């Protein structure tokens, strides 16, 4: 009998009426949730709001009737703490537990299933008793890929449901830690999306966008979402360092969403944002520049209420944004994105010099030499004085020639091997080394002077 089977058998042994006992841990101190520790846990940490917790439990009515047990199913139960996924008593009690702890929780109806109960096993207005064992807990993964790169643990819940969006003006207090040593302690006011200019890692901004006003959280960042392979000399952070931040979102003002803006506002803001993106580009902050240019595209791409004059301005801004995005992606070696933005630019202006040239550069970078050559040739056809295109076309021709020579050599070696194998096979046959069941027939004689059959000589 396994340990869990033994525990399951013991958990079903309750039959006598249960007593109300324990320490009152309800927020209102109304004896709605009573807790008795049956076995102490280890360490000092307890789960925080939003943590994923893993438990075993057994539940009884006050008369001793067991109504549910994860032990019977031999499957640990998990839920996100403080998110309302379980009864109130559980969110309250499990938040006080340590790993390895076993406790009994007595829950009054208002902290359990209330007047309705949970038919057919739990009657209306029922007081319940649970035995709960906590096995582990872990923070909330905020990454889209769920790769564990940004983990949040909420110390203090915020208010309301609103969260900062891209471009929101936020006010925060933060502390950054590397190996338990504080390297950054500041109070800041900035726009979401411009954190890099404030020496903040991208992962922290992503976490801020998931926070509520007044929330105080701990954020753990893997290198990819921190300062990456470059590190941060200003803070003496080495390459590929994992970081921890404690952050308090004091307040924020959401930026207007695209649908909330008039066409005039979109045009005005696009001009401002374009200048900001140019500043970031000149400073070598290409990721920040990308965010700015993407805003322009999102505001203007599907806007159809411009006057004729404003429509021309909007198209010029869109064209410039796609060209600048292509340049940023080339710098970031994101060549597919560069090609995509060049294509968008060329949809707006099919003979655009920069669009053709930058697409050629991106094709060249991914060894699509024929496509690159076609782009550079078109640039020279339209703009014969473009010296950079002439130089890149020469590079293309050299790469294509080198590739052809490599392929020629590869195929030559292949045919040479095949010829050698064929010669060996014929030599074997000539020596009489044939299968016993080989059909015997007259073969045409080779000319001694020629040394090889006519067919092979032609080959």
From Swiss-Prot:
Residues 1-22, 423-459 are annotated as: Disordered. GO terms for molecular function: peptidyl-prolyl cis-trans isomerase activity. Signal peptide: none annotated. The modification N-acetylthreonine is found at residue 2. Transmembrane segments: none annotated. Its EC number is 5.2.1.8. Pfam families: FKBP_C, TPR_1, TPR_2. Keywords: Acetylation, Chaperone, Cytoplasm, Cytoskeleton, Isomerase, Methylation, Microtubule, Mitochondrion, Nucleus, Phosphoprotein, Repeat, Rotamase, TPR repeat. One of its GO terms (cellular component) is mitochondrion. The modification Phosphotyrosine is found at residue 220. Residues 50-138, 167-253 form the PPIase FKBP-type domain. The modification Phosphothreonine is found at residue 143. Homodimer. Interacts with GLMN. Associates with HSP90AA1 and HSP70 in steroid hormone receptor complexes. Also interacts with peroxisomal phytanoyl-CoA alpha-hydroxylase (PHYH). Interacts with NR3C1 and dynein. Interacts with HSF1 in the HSP90 complex. Associates with tubulin. Interacts with MAPT/TAU. Interacts (via TPR domain) with S100A1, S100A2 and S100A6; the interaction is Ca(2+) dependent. Interaction with S100A1 and S100A2 (but not with S100A6) leads to inhibition of FKBP4-HSP90 interaction. Interacts with dynein; causes partially NR3C1 transport to the nucleus. The PPIase activity is mainly due to the first PPIase FKBP-type domain (1-138 AA). Immunophilin protein with PPIase and co-chaperone activities. Component of unligated steroid receptors heterocomplexes through interaction with heat-shock protein 90 (HSP90). May play a role in the intracellular trafficking of heterooligomeric forms of steroid hormone receptors between cytoplasm and nuclear compartments. The isomerase activity controls neuronal growth cones via regulation of TRPC1 channel opening. Also acts as a regulator of microtubule dynamics by inhibiting MAPT/TAU ability to promote microtubule assembly. May have a protective role against oxidative stress in mitochondria. This is Peptidyl-prolyl cis-trans isomerase FKBP4. The gene is FKBP4.
């Amino acid at each position: 009998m396994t340990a869990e089977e033994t525990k399951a058998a013991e958990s079903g042994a309750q039959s006598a009426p249960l007593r109300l006992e324990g320490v009152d841990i309800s927020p209102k101190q109304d004896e709605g949730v009573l807790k008795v520790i049956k076995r102490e846990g280890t360490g000092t940490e307890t789960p925080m709001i939003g943590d994923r917790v893993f438990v075993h439990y057994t539940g009884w009515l006050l008369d001793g009737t067991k109504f549910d047990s994860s032990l019977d199913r031999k499957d640990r139960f998990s839920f996100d703490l403080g998110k309302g996924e379980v009864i109130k008593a559980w969110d309250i009690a499990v938040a006080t537990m340590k790993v390895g702890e076993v406790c009994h929780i007595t829950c009054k109806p208002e902290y359990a299933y209330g007047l309705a109960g949970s038919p057919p096993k739990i009657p209306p207005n029922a007081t319940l008793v649970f035995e709960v064992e906590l096995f582990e807990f872990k923070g909330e993964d905020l990454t889209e890929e769920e790769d564990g790169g940004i983990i949040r643990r909420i110390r203090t819940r915020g208010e309301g449901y609103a969260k900062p969006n891209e471009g929101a003006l936020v006010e925060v207090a933060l502390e950054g830690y590397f190996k338990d040593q504080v390297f950054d302690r500041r109070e800041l006011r900035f726009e979401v999306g411009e954190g890099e200019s404030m020496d903040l890692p991208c992962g922290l901004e992503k976490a801020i966008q998931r926070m509520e006003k007044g929330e105080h959280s701990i954020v753990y960042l893997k290198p990819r979402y921190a300062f990456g392979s470059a590190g941060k000399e200003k803070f003496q952070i080495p390459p590929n360092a994992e970081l921890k931040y404690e952050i308090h979102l004091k307040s924020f003002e959401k930026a207007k969403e695209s649908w909330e803006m008039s066409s005039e506002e979109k045009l005005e803001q696009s001009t401002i944002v374009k200048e900001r993106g140019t500043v970031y580009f000149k400073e070598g902050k290409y990721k920040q520049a990308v965010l700015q240019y993407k805003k322009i595209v999102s505001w203007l791409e599907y806007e159809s209420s411009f006057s004729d004059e404003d429509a021309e301005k909007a198209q010029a801004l869109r064209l410039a944004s796609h060209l600048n995005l292509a340049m940023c992606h080339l710098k970031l070696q994101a060549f597919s994105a560069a090609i995509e933005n060049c294509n968008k630019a060329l949809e707006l202006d099919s003979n655009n010099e920069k669009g053709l040239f930058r697409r050629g550069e991106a094709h060249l970078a991914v060894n699509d030499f024929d496509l690159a050559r076609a782009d550079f040739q078109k640039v020279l056809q339209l703009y014969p004085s473009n010296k950079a295109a002439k130089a890149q076309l020469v590079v293309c021709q050299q790469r294509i020639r080198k590739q052809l020579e490599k392929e020629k050599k590869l195929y030559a070696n292949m045919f040479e091997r095949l010829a050698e194998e064929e010669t060996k096979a014929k030599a074997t046959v000539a020596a009489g080394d044939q299968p016993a069941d080989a059909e015997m027939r007259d073969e045409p004689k080779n000319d001694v002077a020629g040394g090889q059959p006519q067919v092979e000589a032609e080959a």
